[in-house]
Amino acid sequence: MPTLQGTFWCFTLNFSGDAPSLSFNERVQYACWQHERVSHDHLQGYIQMKKRSTLKMMKELLPGAHLEVSKGTPEEASDYAMKEETRVAGPWTYGELLKKGSNKRKLLDRYKENPEDMELEDPAKARRCRAKIDKEKFIAEFKVEDDEQEWKKILEKEIEKIASPRSILWVYGPQGGEGKTSKAKELITRGWFYTRGGKKDDVAYSYVEDPTRHVVFDIPRDMQEYCNYSLIEMLKDRIIISNKYEPITNCQVYNIHVIVMANFLPDVTKISEDRIKIIYC
């Protein structure tokens, strides 16, 4: 089953005794919440994440809370979370609420209205807008093929677990046609970062746009000799370094899953064997 994910979330956290205090990290754009009492005490709240987040990531952020992707506008959801009728204490807030009239949305609207003008005025922004629109279309229209293969079930069980700081999942299918690339595409629709490998600076530069993402490498058969094990380990180790255009070192606290889809087994002279968990197609 595809993983539930979203940017805007509503939550309810039941408790007894004193109301729990909440704290948030840099992944959160905005949060509001209050102590309510209907038949029992609970915290009712709304969270805007900076990037799309899975249900699992949200449960790590708010252990014990019931979470749902918000369906209304940001204003409606925050107003509901801070309604007076059932309030006992609060409300409390964190960060700044982003409304639907943000600059990012206006830029996309401008592109949709007249893409030709933007391509002439600012080709770089036009390319980013086109890429975002195409990705949204891909996510909406991508169809999962055979998702009942045994290796895919094993892989899903692994990525449902809390990511370890060390283990790398290596999906090995020597013949081709096992569905590795299709699975990698499906992971894109769930917010994963997709790459076919390459130069470390180039891949890291793309990744640091959102360095909280899980990563799937879809390595072509002809890249076996040039597989960049240093890049794979760098992303897994959560210290991301890129010297493309300007030196950037991005340090991350939270562990991620890293999957390598390949037609070949890992070269254990180039990567520690104990880091690799092989899943056979």
Swiss-Prot record:
Q: Residue ranges of the CRESS-DNA virus Rep endonuclease domain? A: 3-97
Q: Where is this motif: Nuclear localization signal?
A: 51-71, 97-103
Its recorded reaction(s) are: ATP + H2O = ADP + phosphate + H(+)
Question: Could you confirm whether the keyword Nuclease appears in this record?
Answer: yes
Return the cofactor note field.
Divalent metal cations, possibly Mg(2+) or Mn(2+).
Active site location: 80
Q: Which residues bind a divalent metal cation?
A: 36, 42, 85
State any single GO MF term.
RNA binding
Q: Where does motif RCR-1 map?
A: 10-13
**A GO term (biological process) for this protein?**
DNA replication
Chief site of localization:
host cell
What are the required cofactors?
Mg(2+); Mn(2+)
Q: This protein's superkingdom? A: Viruses
Q: A Pfam family matched by this chain, by name?
A: Viral_Rep
Motif RCR-2 extends across: 42-44
Q: Which UniProt keywords apply?
A: ATP-binding, Covalent protein-DNA linkage, DNA replication, DNA-binding, Endonuclease, Helicase, Host nucleus, Hydrolase, Metal-binding, Multifunctional enzyme, Nuclease, Nucleotide-binding, Nucleotidyltransferase, Transferase
Map motif RCR-3 onto the chain. 80-83
* Record EC number: 2.7.7.-, 3.1.21.-, 3.6.1.-
Q: Which InterPro entries match?
A: CRESS_DNA_REP, Helicase_SF3_ssDNA/RNA_vir
Q: What does this protein do?
A: Initiates and terminates the replication only of its own subviral DNA molecule. The closed circular ssDNA genome is first converted to a superhelical dsDNA. Rep binds a specific hairpin at the genome origin of replication. Introduces an endonucleolytic nick within the intergenic region of the genome, thereby initiating the rolling circle replication (RCR). Following cleavage, binds covalently to the 5'-phosphate of DNA as a tyrosyl ester. The cleavage gives rise to a free 3'-OH that serves as a primer for the cellular DNA polymerase.
Q: Which family does it belong to?
A: Belongs to the nanoviridea/circoviridae replication-associated protein family.
Comment, domains: There are 3 rolling circle replication (RCR) motifs. RCR-2 is probably involved in metal coordination. RCR-3 is required for phosphodiester bond cleavage for initiation of RCR.
Relay the record's extra comment: The genome of nanoviruses is composed of six to eight segments. In addition, some isolates contain subviral DNAs.
**What does the subunit section of this Swiss-Prot or TrEMBL entry state?**
Homooligomer (Potential). Rep binds to repeated DNA motifs (iterons).
Protein name (database record): Para-Rep C1
Q: Which organism is it from?
A: Milk vetch dwarf C1 alphasatellite
Q: What is the lineage of its organism?
A: Viruses, Viruses incertae sedis, Alphasatellitidae, Nanoalphasatellitinae, Mivedwarsatellite
Q: Which gene encodes it?
A: C1
